Swiss-Prot record:
Keywords: Nucleus, Phosphoprotein, Proteasome, TPR repeat. Present with 51900 molecules/cell in log phase SD medium. The modification Phosphoserine is found at S8, S77. It is found in: Nucleus. It comes from the Eukaryota. Its main location: nucleus. SMART domains: PINT (SM00088). GO terms for cellular component: nucleus; proteasome complex; proteasome regulatory particle; proteasome regulatory particle, lid subcomplex. Residues 223-395 form the PCI domain. This is 26S proteasome regulatory subunit RPN7. TPR repeats lie at residues 131-164. One of its GO terms (molecular function) is structural molecule activity.
Amino acid sequence: MVDVEEKSQEVEYVDPTVNRVPNYEVSEKAFLLTQSKVSIEQRKEAAEFVLAKIKEEEMAPYYKYLCEEYLVNNGQSDLEHDEKSDSLNEWIKFDQELYNELCKKNESKIKELNEKIQKLEEDDEGELEQAQAWINLGEYYAQIGDKDNAEKTLGKSLSKAISTGAKIDVMLTIARLGFFYNDQLYVKEKLEAVNSMIEKGGDWERRNRYKTYYGIHCLAVRNFKEAAKLLVDSLATFTSIELTSYESIATYASVTGLFTLERTDLKSKVIDSPELLSLISTTAALQSISSLTISLYASDYASYFPYLLETYANVLIPCKYLNRHADFFVREMRRKVYAQLLESYKTLSLKSMASAFGVSVAFLDNDLGKFIPNKQLNCVIDRVNGIVETNRPDNKNAQYHLLVKQGDGLLTKLQKYGAAVRLTGSDRV
């Protein structure tokens, strides 16, 4: 009876359109400005885009943060010193007049939204109306890049009697603030709260959105195995256009899938994925990672390193989530392809192996030496004879020991079960 009364008191919440706040494209383009390996042309376009969006979306707090903190602390000074880069600072230079103009617009809009909240509370309007008013104000703070006020204001709507689904929407908006500023500790905390809410009553659509959010978080913190599972699954159910684009999700799924999936799954879930195939012709980043994936799967070693370098430049470096993992990814993909080639041989000459990859013997010798000492590759180099000898573990011996171990475990369980049965029988007597 109590449950029925509680449910009747909860205000029915009509799901609103999920607004794209903050604008993830602004954050992604701003990241490009800090990368000296990105072309001058790309950074110029990024600067123009960011400034246009700052003006359009009245982002005074973000504009100040961008110019006085982000670009100063994240490497804009590392730009190449050529005749073009001398003017680069001018593209994103702090303009006090523009900032003051944006601040006035912010103050006017915030005042208007606060007055609506005050009127609703004075008129003792329903919980739903008050909650939506707080959400509107919080989303405006999110839009302009005011993280602290956005979180605090959106949090006030959670205290209203709104549905679990509505609360999940609010928490996902708060989580997007963390993605926008690439604060993954913040994101982790908020997504844990979202997951708790979903377990209490999240619908199918919100569960799928959470899957995408958590998948990108896993990508950002280098949990590629979990990211691959979530992002590959998200391809068929993606709706989180407020967080990222479908093209980006496809690229992330391809990167993590290539890194973690075995050959059979790689073929079915990535190479032959209809969702990915439909985007390749129009998505440059996806073309690079797809070419790398196919070269590995088809053992096309001659084209593997060129595609790996292309992926590094076109996919990893420009991505704010993958950039910090770029060198790690390239290193591990070299190890993976070496292991795949050596799997087919007991011995192989360094010259033949170097020729297969289109590199020098000296480079290959040095590169293999990075993986062999710590057993990341099961082989040794015989420099006297110029060959690589594999020393893979004896699979049959390993299988035998595993069988014995599993048999012992089964025998122990059967003995315990037998003792329990005998005890039950004696009790009955």
